[in-house]
């Protein structure tokens, strides 16, 4: 009998992964409960139906917190990022220019506009946005391409106590899959019941998990390489350490070394990016506006509930009635009957109205102060939403107030841009590793003209630096710096930029004869695109000018 090869990842290793997963799940229980609670508040469900009944059938659920999140989401979506890649060496300048045009195309193909919007909802509500950046070999009819998705935090598991997920010993991502579809894809599977199940949000619809099984993906490092294993139950579906054969082309030539040696991705990082709103020490997840504004929102709801009940009592008079009273109660309660019969003399003690004390104005003032506390705490002030106090009419003063009130949103955007920069870094590394065959892209060339380019990773691969003084200088890998620019999607920003250009033109900044004075003035200014404008004016001033004859017409 021929001896069978024992694969590095088998049933015993999967059982170890499952034990680690269950330990991680127990350690992250508090974080997961907070995320679920925040989502419930977003749905304006501050209590259960049983509490509604106990409170008398009504409880006010106002939308002040809802309005805060909607306003913050609008600010974040307005600052949609655009990447610009800058070379670190002069020889990589052209490559950086092409990548700066190609990476936005890849983001557009992944509908990153929608991914960004969904992630910003997630960041405002639960406190953390999470992205998954992987290579999908099934894209483009099997050619493969980069895939960027927003990930549900309840499906992720990492080592409790770490702030950076890259320092976690293992990283898990679980998903519920249909049992029959999984059995069809892997006919040799022997699926069993009682598998590990994810924690889920409280959906409005009834989610049936009876015919679902949990498929888990685990990422881990071994010998400095990033490895990956996909399993269900105690059975391995795929593991990079089990790929012992090199990757071949159609004619049998070796394309790449076995994945057991190279790992999953050359960059060696977990392909996930966390973007917390308000960071927490010892956790990659932060807390969101729901956690900050929960207390004042509860106070507002309680006071409004009391106000409505007091108004109901005042609008519906109630009466004390004696047991031996002479008033016909049925006719008294029937407003359609103009006559109410009584027996004998009608005394004042037969029927007496219950007095209702109207609320004092101090309670309304307290409600207004609580609402103002919520708005000030969240930064969702009237100025930030476009409402300016009476008496302020100057455009510069209004712009200054709005600029000052938006510093909280700008700080949030800066943290999101840092995460987006790391996403672009992973995209560039995936291009470097997998773009062996040329791809076609439509990019914008000079003056907005369409250009169709073919691109592969040949100029991104490490190249030899030769020898110097008898020593091998090793390999050089093109590396790029990433600058993130905000794509402001509002008419006010565009109008302001256009007005600045017109003012510079009217003041003669584009006159080559005034280039020295214009340069001194522009260097003291700060606006978007200043470096490009300085370069163009410098080139324009350096060009030789033909003398203009006297009396020559335009």
Where on the chain are the PLM-derived regions?
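Extended, helix-rich architectural segments
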Residues: 1-255, 259, 331, 362, ...
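C-terminal anchoring/interaction modules
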Residues: 1-53, 57, 123, 131, ...
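Acidic/polar low-complexity segments with low predicted structural confidence
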Residues: 285-293
């Amino acid at each position: 009998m021929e001896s069978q090869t024992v694969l590095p990842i088998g049933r015993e290793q999967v059982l170890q992964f499952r034990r680690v997963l269950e330990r991680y799940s127990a350690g992250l229980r508090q974080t997961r409960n907070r995320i679920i609670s925040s989502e419930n508040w977003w749905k304006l469900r501050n209590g259960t139906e049983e509490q509604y009944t106990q409170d008398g059938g009504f409880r006010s659920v106002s939308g002040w917190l809802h309005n805060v999140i909607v306003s913050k989401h609008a600010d974040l979506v307005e600052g949609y990022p655009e990447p610009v890649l800058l070379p670190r060496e002069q020889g990589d300048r052209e490559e950086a220019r092409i990548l700066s045009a190609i990476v936005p195309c890849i983001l557009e193909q992944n509908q990153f506009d929608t991914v960004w919007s969904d992630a910003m909802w997630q960041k405002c509500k639960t406190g953390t946005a999470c992205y998954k950046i992987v290579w999908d070999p099934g894209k483009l009819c099997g050619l493969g391409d980069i895939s960027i998705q927003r990930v549900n935090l309840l499906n992720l598991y990492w080592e409790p106590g770490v702030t950076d997920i890259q320092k976690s010993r293992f990283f898990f991502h679980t998903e519920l899959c249909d049992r029959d579809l999984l059995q069809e894809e892997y006919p040799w599977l022997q699926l069993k019941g009682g598998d590990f199940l994810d924690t889920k949000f409280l959906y409005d619809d009834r989610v049936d998990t009876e015919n679902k099984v949990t498929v888990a993906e685990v990422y881990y490092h071994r010998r400095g390489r990033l490895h990956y294993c996909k399993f269900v139950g105690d059975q391995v579906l795929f593991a990079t350490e089990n790929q012992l054969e090199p990757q071949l082309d159609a004619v049998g030539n070796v394309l790449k070394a076995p994945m057991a040696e190279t790992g999953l991705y050359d960059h060696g990082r977990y392909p996930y990016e966390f973007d917390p709103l308000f960071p927490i020490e010892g956790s990659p997840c932060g807390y969101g506006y729901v956690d900050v504004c929960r207390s004042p929102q509860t106070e507002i709801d309680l006071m409004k509930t009391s106000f409505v009940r007091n108004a109901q009592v005042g609008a519906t008079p109630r009466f004390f009635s004696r047991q031996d009273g002479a008033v016909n109660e049925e006719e008294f309660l029937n407003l359609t009957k103009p006559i109410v019969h009584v027996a004998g003399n009608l005394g004042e003690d037969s029927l007496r109205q219950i007095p209702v004390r109207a609320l004092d104005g101090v309670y309304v003032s307290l409600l207004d102060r609580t609402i103002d506390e919520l708005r000030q705490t969240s930064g969702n002030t009237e100025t930030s939403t476009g409402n300016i106090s009476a008496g302020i009419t100057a455009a510069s003063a209004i712009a200054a107030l709005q600029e000052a009130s938006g510093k909280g949103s700008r700080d949030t955007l800066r943290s999101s841009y840092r995460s987006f920069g790391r996403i672009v870094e992973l995209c560039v590394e995936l291009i470097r590793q997998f773009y062996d065959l040329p791809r076609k892209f439509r990019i914008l060339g000079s003056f907005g003209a369409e250009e169709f380019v073919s691109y592969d990773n040949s100029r991104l691969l490490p190249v030899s630096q030769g020898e110097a003084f008898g020593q091998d200088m090793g390999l050089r890998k093109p590396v790029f710096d990433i600058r993130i620019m905000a794509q402001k999607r509002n008419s006010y920003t565009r109008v302001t930029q256009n007005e600045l250009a017109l003012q510079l033109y009217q003041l003669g900044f584009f006159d080559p004869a005034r280039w020295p004075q214009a340069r001194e003035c522009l260097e003291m200014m700060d606006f978007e695109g200043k470096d490009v404008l300085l370069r163009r004016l410098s080139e324009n001033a350096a060009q030789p000018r033909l003398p203009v004859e006297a009396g020559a017409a335009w």
